[in-house]
Each structure stands twice: as C-alpha cells, then as structure tokens.
Amino acid sequence: MTLNKCNPTTPSRRHTVKVVNNKLYKGKSFFKLTKSLNKSGGRNNQGRITTRHIGGRHKRKYRLIDFKRNKDDILAKVKRLEYDPNRSSNIALISYEDGEMRYILEAKGLKIGDKVQSGINAPIKIGNALPIKMFPFGSILHNIEIKPGKGGQIARSAGSYAQVVTHEKNYVIVKLRSGEIRKIFSECKATFGEVGNSEYMLKSLGKAGANRWRGIRPTVRGTAMNPIDHPHGGGEGKNFGKHPVSPWGVQSKGKKTRKNKRTEKYILYNRKYKK
C-alpha cells in the first residue's frame, strides 16, 4: 500500500494524494453478498431534510459484512481483498470449508490465502474472532461487540483498534483510541488485530468535487448567513458576539449530548470529561 501524489497537471490534481493498494480485487463484488442501496438525500419519508449536508454521490451497492462472526469452529480461507465504497476500511471475502462465503473487515496484515476462524477454540492470530475474555493483557482488537451476539460496534473504521487493559470478574477493560476506557462484557466477541487501510487518513481529496462524489454537500458557516437563517447571521463584520450555537439555538460547544444514562456505568474514563 503506497501514497500516490498526483502530478500538478490541473489545479485540483496539484493537491491530490491517493492511497494505492495493488492487492485489491479489481472485479465486481460477490453477487450474493451485495444489495442495492437507495439515496435519501438526507430527507425522511415526508421529504423534509433531517440530516444536512447530504446529497448527490455516485451510485454504489451495499456489501453485507459479517460483524457477528458467529460461524464458530470452521476454518475459512481469505479469497480476496476488496474495496468497499461504504466504509473507510477494506473488506475481505472469505470462504468456509462448507462452501459458505462471507465478507469481513480486513485486519492489518491479513493476506490472500490466510486461514481465519471464530469461536472460543480459535487460536489468537490476526483476523480470528474470539470471546474478549480469551485475549491477554495488551492485545490489540477491533470489531468489538457491546452486547453478545449483536455484532461488532466498536473499532470498525480504517486503522482503528482498542487495547485490552485488564480483566475484572465478568468484564474486560479496554482502552479506545479516543482515550475512553470502558468495560466490555467478557462473552462479547472481538477480532484480533487492528483494522487495515490505516493510510486512509493521509490521502487528500484535492478538490471540492471529490466530496460531492461521496455525497457530502457544502457546509455553510452561520456567520455567512442572514439573521433569518442562523443565530450567527447578519451584523457588520465577522464577529457574531455570542456563544456558538446550532441553527436552532442549541449550544454547539461543550454541551453534553449523550442521553443514555443507563450505560454510563460501563464508561470508566470519558474521552472528554474526566470521571
């Protein structure tokens, strides 16, 4: 995997940096694990905008990823590595000994032809999924479940991981890259290793149009609007003279947004607020 800086033949290519991986499969995705994906444009069923800055984008299809890794004690072979337009990480197509095919997240260091396995009896190696209680201190993990059987929800993006800090009765303490330290139930599954494609954050889009290909519309500053459109709008000069707020007047810096108090007991150290 290399970074390719484009020649400055046009103003946009002058700043474009691409991530090139020659090991990725260049054909179509596996048909039985692919389904259509409709565009919403950020609108709900009434046609009203519920999420701003969404619209356009290139057509894409959704790849069904196996986040649960619930096919235990059966060896699978990595057939190929693929690009996935729906996430920052790449994916791997694996074939089980009974013939079933599944997509999983590509772990860093996973190669074509490698064997992977899931279950409590699986060895601790790159790409294998086990209950988190089986991993020793200092282990690097990704695709970590919060509820057993629900599927991995933590550390799924490119280059992300969590580290096992200690074991505590029925829980395992892990540290996330954000700095958060939290408790995970010991029966939850996790995959050994970190997510691949860690160079993803080093690329440069080069032009605004590249963001439009991804379905991201422009974000207009509140100070550039009129008073009718935003609390920061209007006035002479650039200073809006008040605490930063959202377009609806809600405090936008420093306000806590987490509402699920029931699960706060599992967060030992918050990434923003010391506990």
Swiss-Prot record:
Pfam families: Ribosomal_L2 (PF00181), Ribosomal_L2_C (PF03947)
GO-annotated molecular function: rRNA binding; structural constituent of ribosome; transferase activity
Entry annotated with the keyword Plastid: no
Region (Disordered): 221-275
Positions with biased composition (Basic residues): 253-262
Record key words, sorted: Ribonucleoprotein, Ribosomal protein, RNA-binding, rRNA-binding
InterPro entries tied to this protein: NA-bd_OB-fold (IPR012340), Rib_uL2_dom2 (IPR014722), Ribosomal_uL2 (IPR002171), Ribosomal_uL2_bac/org-type (IPR005880), Ribosomal_uL2_C (IPR022669), Ribosomal_uL2_CS (IPR022671), Ribosomal_uL2_dom3 (IPR014726), Ribosomal_uL2_RNA-bd_dom (IPR022666)
Function (record text): One of the primary rRNA binding proteins. Required for association of the 30S and 50S subunits to form the 70S ribosome, for tRNA binding and peptide bond formation. It has been suggested to have peptidyltransferase activity; this is somewhat controversial. Makes several contacts with the 16S rRNA in the 70S ribosome.
Protein name per Swiss-Prot or TrEMBL: Large ribosomal subunit protein uL2
Biological source species: Wigglesworthia glossinidia brevipalpis
Gene name per UniProt: rplB
